[in-house]
Amino acid sequence: MSDIMSTLTARAEEAEGVLKKYLPAETGYQKKVIEAMNYSLMAGGKRIRPVLMREVYRLLGGKDAAVIEPFMAAIEMIHTYSLVHDDLPAMDNDEYRRGRKTTHIVYGAGMATLAGDGLLNYAYEVAMKGFLSGVKLPPYDGEIADRTAMALTILAEKAGIYGMVGGQCADIEAEGKKEVDSAELIFIHENKTAAMLESSMMIGAVLAGADKAQVLEVEQAARKIGVAFQIQDDILDVIGDEKELGKPILSDEKNEKTTYVTLHGLEESKKDVERLSKEAEDMLSKIDGSREFLIPLVDWMISRNK
């Protein structure tokens, strides 16, 4: 596990370097919102989404930084905007994230809202640089022939009402219900958590030149990873170590929130994590070289203790 962590740290530093290339300059009358955007982006983290994107891109034969790097930056900006909005008083009202004060605590709720809006819009502006790079890619055999246009479509769809935003909506709606069934909970996990992992890996595949069947298989693998990741999160809320997690356990129970564990029990939840993990890794193993870093990374993500 130490080998995967050292490799992940190195890859995360590479992704951070890419992100820094696209930070907006903190100037002009809009300087304050840009400061808040950059504060949020530079809060640290393992940069899992851009790391996954680049790794899939590399394994499937992608070689051009001008094509992939704008999308790496864009996916992290969208992920960060979602965290900024999640932390707001109207949502989770969190004061700390990744060991430092959240954006709304430092800049106020209004400016934090604008910072999230700014990150979402700037993400698409940055991604367009990949579209305008001038690099010629082979036609895609899906609904859209142009690969960068397809990547932009995936980015928008997985982040929006048919992806992350839709999952967040269902999650908020579920908070007010006494009973949430398994189908609704899986919908939340597939969209709120898995959709952006799907986006990361699918975009890497599309831009590398993968055919439609391969892209769809990558999507299915990423969905299984995302759901397993969230079930593991529910498990850790019951049996995790508070010091390792850096937050109190049993918070879902105290908030009377329906989780995978409350619906299916602890042992069944563990079995489903193992099953989903194996299914995802079996799919990814068809990609040459995936056992060197990609599959160990997925295994670490799902079997983590914090």
Segments and roles (model prediction):
Residues M1-L23:
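N-terminal amphipathic/basic leader segments beginning at the initiator methionine
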Residues E14, L23-L284, E292-I302:
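Mg2+-dependent prenyl diphosphate-binding active-site environment of isoprenoid biosynthetic enzymes
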Residues N305-K306:
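Short cytosolic juxtamembrane segments of multi-pass membrane proteins
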